[in-house]
Swiss-Prot record:
Key words of the record: 4Fe-4S, ATP-binding, DNA damage, DNA repair, DNA-binding, Exonuclease, Helicase, Hydrolase, Iron, Iron-sulfur, Metal-binding, Nuclease, Nucleotide-binding
The EC number(s) this enzyme carries: 3.1.-.-
Residues that coordinate or bind [4Fe-4S] cluster: 786, 1105, 1108, 1114
Organism whose genome encodes this protein: Acetivibrio thermocellus (strain ATCC 27405 / DSM 1237 / JCM 9322 / NBRC 103400 / NCIMB 10682 / NRRL B-4536 / VPI 7372)
One Pfam family of this chain: UvrD_C
Described purpose of this protein according to its UniProt entry: The heterodimer acts as both an ATP-dependent DNA helicase and an ATP-dependent, dual-direction single-stranded exonuclease. Recognizes the chi site generating a DNA molecule suitable for the initiation of homologous recombination. The AddB subunit has 5' -> 3' nuclease activity but not helicase activity.
Cofactor annotation comment: Binds 1 [4Fe-4S] cluster.
Name under which the protein is recorded: ATP-dependent helicase/deoxyribonuclease subunit B
Amino acid sequence: MSLRFIYGRAGSGKTRFCLEEIKSRITSKATHPLVLLVPEQFTFQAERDLISVLGTGGILKTEVLSFSRIAYRTFNEAGGITYPHIHSAGKCMILYRILDKMKGSFRVFSKTADRQGFVNTLSTLITEFKKYNVTPEDLEKVSKELEEDNPVKEKLMELTAIYDLFEKTIAERYRDPDDDLTLAAKKLGSIPLYDGAEIWIDGFTGFTPQEYQIIGQLMKKAQRVNISFCTDCLDGDLNDTDIFSSIKTAYRKLVKMAKENGIPVEPSVVLNSKPLFRFSQSPELSHLEQYLYAYPYKTYNEKTKDISLFSSVNIFAEVEACARDIVRLCRDRGMRYREIAVVTGNLDGYEKLIEAVFSEYGIPCFIDRKVDIVNHPLVRLIMSMLDIFIENWSYEAVFRYLKTGLTGIDRESIDRLENYVLACGIRGSCWTETEEWKMVPELIPNEKSLEEAKELLEDVNRIRAQVVAPLMEFRKKTKGRKKASDFCASLYDFLCTLGIPEKIEDAIEKFRESGNLNLANEYSQVWNAVMEVFDHTVEVMGDETFGIEKFARILEIGFGECKIGLIPASLDQVLVGSLERSRSHEIKALYILGANDGVFPPAVMEEGILSDQDRAVLNNAGIELASDTRTQAFDGQYLIYRALTTAGNYLRISWSIADHEGRTLRPSLVVFRLRKLFLNITETSNILPSGSLEEEMELLSGNSPAFKSMVSALRQKADGKEIKPVWQEAYRWFAVQDEWRGKCEALRAAFQYKNLAQPVSREKIAALYGEPAVSSVSRLEKYTACPFAFYVQYGLGAKERQIYSLRPPDVGTFMHAVIEKFSRMVAKRNISWRDLDRDWCSEKVSEIVDEMLEKMQGSGIAASRRYTALTLRLKRVVARAVWLIAEHIRRSSFEPVAYEVGFGENGKYPPIVIELDSGEKIHLTGRIDRVDALKTEDGTYLRIVDYKSGGKDFKLSDVFYGLQIQLITYLDALWESGEADENNPVLPGGVLYFKIDDPIIRGNGRMTEEEIEKAIMKQLRMKGLLLADVKLIREMDKDIEGSSMIIPATVNKDGSLGKNTSAATMEQFKLLRKYVRKLLKNLCEEIMKGNVSINPYKKKGTTSCKYCSFLPVCQFDTTMKENTFKLLYDKKDDEIWSLMAQEEEE
């Protein structure tokens, strides 16, 4: 029996020495057992290293073990191997159950016990207690010794209670894997296992008390225990700031243990001879290893070749640069992928990018990490399915479930169902009611839309039944409080009903066929992992009954503890790992990614349940635990040292100056240290590209990335910039390769592309719009705003996805419909508007609103029934509007003669027919909200009123440009229809917009109710264009004195019209009529020609693109010379009249 230490600095050959010694024992035909003991995560690599030294035959004579494997072997020999272990998921479930029972008695943990993640943190702490042999009795003893006012006392008491109950619960049926080493240490001495063995312990920086116990037993049994340590020396004073401090502490403990057991300590094997084995070919890396944390230090003055720094504009560019350099090393220096490693302090932030970019560059890589199953589609399916019942069939839960891809419903059906559900606001009991869905995704459905939706409803109800059936079958079995066994059995049946096991097998096969072995490996483990969680749930929760919400929480805790370990799919791969798991042998080149402040080294973890102060209290009481945050910070320096000294030939350290969101990042202090050590260190960057040929050539590191870089370069050439000839040569190469020829042709077409919409043929126009073509005046206004938007919306019939919500247009449409119903009721009952009573108006409006809301199923407005305030506001606004209409009519001699006057096949009037030069005819349809009339000796004056819920002003310049021609066109149609009657001709009285609104009146608090009403009336004054006839205007507002409160007119004291009057003479109305007719004809000519140009307008600070839904379709971009706005300018009315007159003369 003896103990021997093998030590040396990083790269000195400690592992190789151990392997060579094992080889020599095998060569000398030693009969005693040979054991190599390494950390759990490095066993696979250690076996590979052993094979490389010994060959496949030698590996059979040597055991590569970890501490947990030694425990397993011990139980196998001494008994206890069949004792049921509890998984970490089961431990967390037990802790959740304990916390749930004890939460009423907590004071310290009363607020944190229910927080997500607390159970996992508590489980980690208990694991730490066990690794350091701390029992509940130890904690209780310390808590009793503390003063009553000590804040740690109560925390320790609560932890003791939790820990003690946990231990008792575990002892009933299980064994905690965290106890294995303690139990194994007790049994190891009584069995012959490893008697006379020679053991090499390699790769550790320190040990837990449990591991010390195992080592102590091995010392007593083995003929020799060899322990290798990475350190400069073993003696000397301990200093917390020494990067080898934890190793020297471990050495002292082991020596003390050996002496206590009478085991001799042999002279140490020192491997610090210069140059160190690993760095024999690189003086630079040797200098780095020697002086990284040395004070004082020597500088390296020559230009570095093996060490370089690289700063990148962002993380993606950093990973790309790394991939290009790896390709360069393999191509120019003959390195193998397995000789290269990538290490980062932020693996979570880099791993997806590394996978994607390395794949593009054809670099095989293995990312050394364990995969959480929480985000696996199978787990998301289970949790979202449970959420459906917990959240009462919320939209989010249902479609999280459906979009896992495991339900057996195709994506097209899911999309169709989702569109319907969003449009109709389906939720809650709507999913489970026995009646089929009959809601129509339309604001105010009519008979025609109901008929058209028949096919949609049949399809949607079929999909709905397919979705609901298995879910309701599961819910029927799990309604109310059930045992875990009932829940898990029902859940298993549910998964089998969906055919999940078969789907998982199919996915594994597809991944294997496509060469994606990592995903195949992951999927092959996930089903078993889920089944294990079910088993633990049943075992832990026993006969306790609970509801579905608690069951979901238990599963969530269980899945959160499940991680899948992956193994490399091939031998020749780049190893990618975190700073903590960066150990690897025979690495020639190392890339450090993300060498940023706070990442390299990683920021110290939060203190957790026990703060540094709490740990200090326990330490003073003789209880040893894991290191505090201060010690962890110093340990971080050792991690940096170990990482930077991993490679023997090449080291490249890179960092980004900005993250994904553009926030500034600082380089790590390590970077500044390297700049001090190496005064002439090679440093490059892609922040400001030099454009040199060498730099451009680096971009040709792989076909796919080279093609992308070539596209970027050729784009610059197309923009008139100079590029290197290499890119034209690259294009010629790609163009003759079969794999890339098609892409080059597409590229050529792309560079010739102009964002222009080509005219549509007459045949297609006829097919889209019919023969004769039918449109509306409002649509022609849309065509004026942008021909392409008109074509997409009305020609192709594109629509925005309807969302079940109350938007301003919905409110406006609804209020418009209420006023229409009210107006028809007044006319039907033959009631004069002048006789209406305000209370009666409010009462009838309220009845109409309630009646419409009752009928409106599946529209956004229907939801307002649940919001009393909104319903009341609708009633108030519409009641005010009808009362204001009545007040306008009372003040006027004009009488309403028609409501909702339609132009078209089923309207009161025939469609407005526009005959084109080609002989083609276009029928324009439309609807007038209200027509008022006044009979005089000269004829009947008509006034058209249009109700608007938004702010709509009348601008003559907008009429001139074609943006506001609707009311003038309607007036013209009525005017023309009445011109034939010579005895009573129809004459234009005006066109007006009536605003439906609930304005806020700003004034002092002393305003009377009458003053408030006047202010509201003035604010809601109609806007538009009137006939410039004082007599007629007085008929429109009999109370007018100065500025009218109801129409856009002012009468001066001398009886003339004021300058603020919006009016036109009879001649001007005739001119306007002719101009609009000509404008309509021109617009229709352009439509029938197939002009669908992307030509939006810009007027002052607004454009027709501002609220356009089709911008992603047209991709209008002002940086492209062919994409320009049609510039419109507001002009004075006199100038507009003059321009119209000029048009007429032409």
